[in-house]
């Protein structure tokens, strides 16, 4: 089947590039130990509720639900899995979960091994997570599974004439909680009616983040009452645009928090800058005052940094298929 072949090829590709790239290398290290980690940390006879998020953004979207369930059902244990290192590396010590680990690649053998170990009493997949083999196996084992804060668009493969396989993937969900009425209508057209519109959980999380935001004295010194533009989770095409603007407007300061914190990418950002800059991990009270651009080269600060910007930008990656293939 094409899907399983694509997963195998992706797995091979990650292994091939891991020696040369930091992010795939971290992912593979996490995958190598995931089953042993589960054997060591799973509590015998405990009941686990499993949450899966692709990355940090999806985790933040599902976090209000995780914490409400944690508070309401304290006898249950929480398992949190990530696909991306940018989620796992930041939240591997998240206190709202009992176990945090990577999700093994969606190959049938991995799926059976993972579910045999965890045996969750229910599962929540956040937003765009539609892993076929996991969902098929959960349905086969009669484990309730829910899609949370999902959003659907007309161009996704589920709504194409050739998308029957992927429509069946959606039918594995016991219920789908979507962000808007349009998503509900699209699903109804393909016969999926176990759907509820609940809005965007990011708004709940934004209010929570506002209460939890940390003071960052170095960022305050950098800003120094100057018009500051914050670019969060940026990618190279975004950076080309706002760095060009920044270079031509000396009255504006810039804070860049790139999605990929890789040394090669950071060097590429620096190469484009024509004004003084400093990296956050190398900043002090003296050099941060002289900089016009602050590069955030570490994880975990972005939610606290946005409030320092007069204008903020966050890149939202478009998922044309709505699935990881």
Put a short name on every predicted segment.
Residues 2, 6, 10-17:
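Membrane-interacting alpha-helical segments
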Residues 15, 19-212, 235-236, 259-261, ...:
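Active-site and donor-binding regions of nucleotide-sugar-utilizing enzymes
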Residues 58-69, 215-283:
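Conserved catalytic-core segment of nucleotide-activated headgroup transferases in glycan assembly
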Residues 115-118, 210-215, 269-271, 289-297:
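Short, surface-exposed amphipathic charged segments that create phosphate/polyanion-binding patches used
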Residues 117-119, 223-224, 308:
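Glycine-rich phosphate-binding loop signature in dinucleotide/nucleotide-binding domains
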Residues 202, 281-312:
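Donor nucleotide-activated moiety binding/catalytic core segment of transferases
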Residues 314-321:
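Conserved small/polar residues in nucleotide/adenosyl-binding loops
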